[in-house]
Every structure is written in C-alpha cells, then in structure tokens.
Amino acid sequence: MNVQAGFVELVVRNLDKIEEVKESFPVTGGIDIIVKVEGPDVETIAKTILAKIHSIEGVSRTETHIVVPL
C-alpha cells in the first residue's frame, strides 16, 4: 500500500482497528506498508479493502495479492 507523505503512522494505527487486518508492516522501497488481511472468502477480503482500508485518511493506493495453496 502507498500512503501520502507523513501518514504512515496514522494509517498503521487505523489498520490495527480493523478486525480482518492481522498484521501491518511499514517498509522501505516502492511501497509504504505491507498489510496481511484474512477473511472467510475473497468477497469479505474485497469488502474490507474497498470499504474499510480505502477509506482511511492518507491511503493513496493498494495492490492486492492472494496467497494460493500449492
């Protein structure tokens, strides 16, 4: 996820309030925060990202990757 300059700490604090967010890590490089979201199905995860995470002040972009079992 990318956030606006100066918003990393605020975004992480707000992510911690979301039940489906299991972990969040500020990182360096091309993205600002890596977020682990869990849910019973893809629809729940999508709703969490679109309705809850995208509404956090400072969030400018998300990119979703889904883990698939081998």
Please state what every model-predicted region is.
Residues 1-70:
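A compositional/biophysical signature of low hydrophobicity enriched in polar/charged and small residues
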